[in-house]
């Protein structure tokens, strides 16, 4: 099959970086270099160019989709003769550990909140819906943190369902990477946003991913637009190790850090432990549970070196 035939039969439209960047049209840059610096992750070089060429076209596309969704809601209200409330638009962001999901989520939150049509954009990570460490230890799942069985899926689905139903003041648990656990009584309140961005490893998973916990409704059932942040496995491993080394010099030095004992490691020891953690936990989770969900996404962003996106695939 030729490349042309593959494109015609693919469920995705594919764009290289320059083709995607051209779709920005006249959308203005609304972030300063200082704001971008505060949005980037510990392991990334996020530039004005990256925001302009990748994220501004994406924010333009999302604004079109959101506006179309609002028109559809208006049609339904006209048909029913009601004046209902606005239903939040839910965007999910999935991908491997260390790929940069959180940065993508923060940049989109900042850009979308600057569109006049939808000022209130909330960001929630699914880490908060992990079972507390006490439960994971009881179930012998501490080395499976991030795997499907480590999440309180009933609570996560209830949260997303409530948001989509327009329920006010919905609470979401908050996770601390410092203590490596859910914060007791640290819930965040989400009150009827225009847009909810939901970021996490598991937001594209469905029933077949949870044979141990059968239920019929999933997060993906409530999502309006889903993004998968992708990268080659060798880069993911390198980024994970580099991030671990930076944490060793930063967050791990805090005496309250769950991983404080790693701060005393030599660089070689730290690289060896990070490599082991990657292979035994994160790579395994990627292969078994995360990567198989990639083709369920509305849009796939593929990164190359330096976290630069060089390919975008958009579902037709």
Swiss-Prot record:
ATP binds at residues 95-102. GO terms for biological process: coenzyme A biosynthetic process. One of its GO terms (molecular function) is ATP binding. It catalyses: (R)-pantothenate + ATP = (R)-4'-phosphopantothenate + ADP + H(+). Belongs to the prokaryotic pantothenate kinase family. This is Pantothenate kinase. One of its GO terms (cellular component) is cytoplasm. HAMAP family: Pantothen_kinase_1. The gene is coaA. InterPro entries: P-loop_NTPase (IPR027417), PanK (IPR004566), PRK/URK (IPR006083). Keywords: ATP-binding, Coenzyme A biosynthesis, Cytoplasm, Kinase, Nucleotide-binding, Transferase. Its EC number is 2.7.1.33. It is found in: Cytoplasm. Pathway: Cofactor biosynthesis; coenzyme A biosynthesis; CoA from (R)-pantothenate: step 1/5.
């Amino acid at each position: 099959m030729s490349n042309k035939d593959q494109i015609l039969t693919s469920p995705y439209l594919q764009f290289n970086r320059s083709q995607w960047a051209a779709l920005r049209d006249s959308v203005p840059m609304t972030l300063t270099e200082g704001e971008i610096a505060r949005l980037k992750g510990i392991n990334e070089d996020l530039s004005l160019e990256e925001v302009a060429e990748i994220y501004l076209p994406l924010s333009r596309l999302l604004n079109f989709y959101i506006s179309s969704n609002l028109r559809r809601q208006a049609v339904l209200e006209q048909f029913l003769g009601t004046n209902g409330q606005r239903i939040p638009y839910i965007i999910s962001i999935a991908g491997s550990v260390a790929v940069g999901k959180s940065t993508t989520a923060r940049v989109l939150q900042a850009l979308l909140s600057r569109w006049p049509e939808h000022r209130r954009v909330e960001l929630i990570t699914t880490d908060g819906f992990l079972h507390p460490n006490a439960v994971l230890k009881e179930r012998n799942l501490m080395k499976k943190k991030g795997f499907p069985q480590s999440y309180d899926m009933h609570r996560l689905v209830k949260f997303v369902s409530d948001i989509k139903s327009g329920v006010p003041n919905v609470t979401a648990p908050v996770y601390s990477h410092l203590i490596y656990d859910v914060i007791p009584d640290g819930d965040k309140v989400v009150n009827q946003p225009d847009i909810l961005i939901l970021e996490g490893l598991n937001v594209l998973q469905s029933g077949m991913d949870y044979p141990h916990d059968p239920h019929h409704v999933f997060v993906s059932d409530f999502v309006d637009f889903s993004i998968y942040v992708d990268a080659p496995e060798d880069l993911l491993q390198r980024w994970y190790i580099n991030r671990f080394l930076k944490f060793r010099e930063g967050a791990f030095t805090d005496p309250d850090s769950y991983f404080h004992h790693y701060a005393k490691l030599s660089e070689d020891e730290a690289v060896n432990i990070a490599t082991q953690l990657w292979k035994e936990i994160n790579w395994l989770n990627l292969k078994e549970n995360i990567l198989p969900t990639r083709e369920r996404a509305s849009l796939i962003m593929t990164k190359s070196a330096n976290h630069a996106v060089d390919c975008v695939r958009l579902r037709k």
